[in-house]
Regions:
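Tubular lipid-binding modules of the TULIP superfamily
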Residues: 1-113, 142-216
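Extended lipid/amphipathic-ligand handling interfaces
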Residues: 85, 128-139
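Amphipathic hydrophobic-ligand
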Residues: 114-131
Length: 216
């Protein structure tokens, strides 16, 4: 059977191409990976995103924090190796790995005049693995994009299970928000001499994301 099957056109992007696209996207927009409140980040910039402190009674100005992610890397089905349980990479899925560094501004006591003490950064770095799948958004021939939707997130080497559940949930929300900005436009998937009218896909097989359709 031909690659196009019952369709007139087939296009794909392989695992290396996806990772190159992620490198290019986040390399040009590092503020999608670096978030912090004052004093860690003082204003929005091309490299960082300012967020509000966490309000809490009795903590003047709120709890300061920062979250930094490394550029995610993908592994398209079939997997290059086994994932940590309970994660299993199935057909039409991809895994993403990143390192998340969470920093809290810890107030070290009070000064002699009773004012708030100095804020000291306390950080931890976590290895994060997620499983997701591609979805498409189509507007017109050749115009649209593929994005990623998460199915499950695991923070490795965390105990007890209750803390694992909290961190898994936290990182799933953060990664989902970050990935909602990532779009792989059709023009990096299809070829220059035709504009794809999307009819099927995206699917994942043979380490590539595949879409099918007609041509314009």
């Amino acid at each position: 059977m031909s690659l196009t099957g019952t369709h007139h056109a087939f296009a794909s992007i392989d695992e290396r191409g996806v990772n190159r696209a992620l490198q290019a996207f986040f390399g040009a927009r590092p503020h999608y990976l670096h978030y912090g409140s004052v004093p860690f980040v003082t204003s929005d910039s091309t490299t960082e995103t300012l967020v509000q402190t966490i309000a809490f009674p009795g903590v003047p100005g709120g709890i300061a924090y920062a979250i930094d992610l490394t550029i995610p890397t993908t592994d398209l089905y079939p997997p290059d190796g086994a994932l940590p349980p309970p994660l299993v990479l199935g057909p039409d899925q991809l895994s993403l790995t990143t390192e998340a560094t969470i920093t809290i501004g810890c107030t070290a006591g009070q000064s002699a005049d009773g004012k708030r003490g100095q804020v000291m950064p306390v950080s931890t770095s976590l290895d994060v693995i997620a499983i997701g799948h591609p979805v498409s958004v189509y507007f017109s021939p050749g115009v649209g994009y593929v994005r990623f939707q998460l199915d499950q997130v695991l923070v490795e080497n965390v105990a007890p299970p209750s803390l694992q559940a909290v961190l898994d949930c936290l990182l799933e929300m953060i990664l989902s928000a970050v990935l909602s900005s990532v779009e792989l436009p059709f023009n990096i998937i299809d070829v220059d001499f035709f504009k794809l009218i999307l009819e099927a896909g995206p699917t994942i097989a043979d380490n590539q994301i595949e879409i099918w359709g007609d041509v314009s």
